[in-house]
From Swiss-Prot:
Belongs to the zinc-containing alcohol dehydrogenase family. The keyword Isomerase does not apply. It comes from the Bacteria. This is (R,R)-butanediol dehydrogenase. The gene is budC. Its EC number is 1.1.1.4. NAD-dependent butanediol dehydrogenase which catalyzes the oxidation of (R,R)-butane-2,3-diol to (3R)-acetoin and of meso-butane-2,3-diol to (3S)-acetoin. Preferentially oxidizes (R,R)-butane-2,3-diol, with a catalytic efficiency approximately fourfold higher than with meso-butane-2,3-diol. Shows a very low activity with (S,S)-butane-2,3-diol. Can also catalyze the reduction of (3R/3S)-acetoin and diacetyl in the presence of NADH. It catalyses: (R,R)-butane-2,3-diol + NAD(+) = (R)-acetoin + NADH + H(+); (S)-acetoin + NAD(+) = diacetyl + NADH + H(+). It comes from Neisseria gonorrhoeae (strain ATCC 700825 / FA 1090). The lineage of its organism: Bacteria, Pseudomonadati, Pseudomonadota, Betaproteobacteria, Neisseriales.
């Protein structure tokens, strides 16, 4: 079967590899669509990062580069392994793409996403969504309704990142949120917030991203910091108080500074983006306003609720898909476009079976 294989920085190859074995306790999936994630781009431009370098196998998967890529994917079950009796051939599914140790508890209230040596399918080994087929442990396979188109279903994984950020924020219906940055995660986070009855203000410089936020209906207000004083505008929109929650989705220090100043006293500020460099923060403002600054990473028992929001029609993922491509065009039409034209491309999805 065809698969996209990461060898090293700038070296991703489309190769023929053996089909996976559907072992006991696993589910065989024909991949329908797989999204290209910002993490994939970082691996391509700067890696290996999450991907274990050649000769240095991951302690759980036992694999190192080359590995099959892709962790945002949907598909159709073609086989189930021995012991799997609650999923049937032909069901539509998405995958929560974790690689964790078998003895880590994954029930409600656990923090399995923070466990030692955690990694992701499509990065740390165990196959990937940028291939025709994959076999995944039953625990990480989530059935979805046939009402959700499989191309949109590929966005449930990044949507779950947004949902986990929402959970971490403690936001509730009627609150006002400020989202710094309208990239893919910022937009999907905003979609979750709107679905939960929260008023959303987005701050963004890019015209294309502002347009996408407007077209998708995920923002009540969109502020361009090159045109207005964001903090002053937020105060006007909140009767002088500031926002209840804020989300940093850019890895840009000026945005972080703006969010701190736009928060009301006792607000929660969630850092969503992955920073590759140190940040500074006005600690005096944090202290004097008793702000609660929180991190968030990936997701943890978020997929069920995220799937429900989409199935019930509270979130429409179609507006966020900006291009559909074949696996053979992964680098030339996928990675290269996202690297050089990332403002206009929200989510490019790949069909490995075309």
């Amino acid at each position: 079967m065809k698969a996209a294989r990461f060898y090293n920085k700038g070296d991703i190859r489309i190769e023929d590899i053996p089909e996976p074995t559907v072992a006991p306790g696993t589910v065989g999936i024909n991949v329908a669509w797989c999204g290209i994630c910002g993490t994939d781009l970082h691996e391509f431009m700067e890696g290996p990062i999450f991907i274990p370098p050649c000769g240095h196998p991951h302690p759980i998967s036992g694999e190192s580069a080359p590995v099959t890529m892709g962790h945002e994917f949907s598909g159709v079950v073609y086989a189930v392994g021995e012991g799997v009796d609650d999923i049937k051939v032909g069901q539509h599914v998405v995958v929560e793409p974790y690689i964790i140790r078998d003895d880590v508890p994954t029930g409600e209230g656990s923090n399995y996403h923070l466990s030692k040596d955690m990694n992701f399918i499509g990065l740390g080994g165990c196959g990937g969504g940028l291939s025709e087929k994959i076999a995944v442990k039953r625990r990480w396979v989530h059935p979805i309704s046939d009402k959700i188109p499989l191309d949109q279903a590929a966005l449930i994984e990044p949507l779950s990142v947004g949902h986990h950020a929402y959970v971490r924020s403690g936001a509730k219906a009627g609150d006002v949120a400020l989202v710094g940055g309208a990239g893919p995660i910022g937009l999907l986070l905003a979609a979750v917030l709107k679905a939960k009855g929260i008023k959303v203000i987005i701050t963004e410089l890019s015209k294309a991203r502002k347009d996408k936020a407007r077209e998708s209906g995920v923002a009540d207000y969109i502020l361009d910091p090159s045109e207005v004083d964001v903090v002053e505008e937020v105060k006007k929109l909140t009767n002088g108080e500031g926002v209840d929650v804020a989300f940093e989705c850019t890895s840009v220090n000026k945005v972080l500074d703006t969010l701190v100043e736009a928060c009301k006293p006792a607000a929660n500020l969630v850092i969503v983006s992955i920073w590759s460099h140190p940040a500074t923060v006005n600690v005096h403002s944090v202290v004097m306003k008793e702000l609660d600054v929180r991190g968030t990473i990936a997701y943890c028992n978020d997929h069920a609720e995220t799937i429900k929001l989409v199935e019930e029609g509270k979130i429409n993922l179609e507006p966020f898909i900006t291009q559909r491509i074949k696996l053979d065009k992964l680098v030339s039409e996928g990675f290269e476009r996202l690297i050089h034209n990332n403002e206009s491309a929200v989510k490019i999805i790949v069909n490995p079976n075309l």
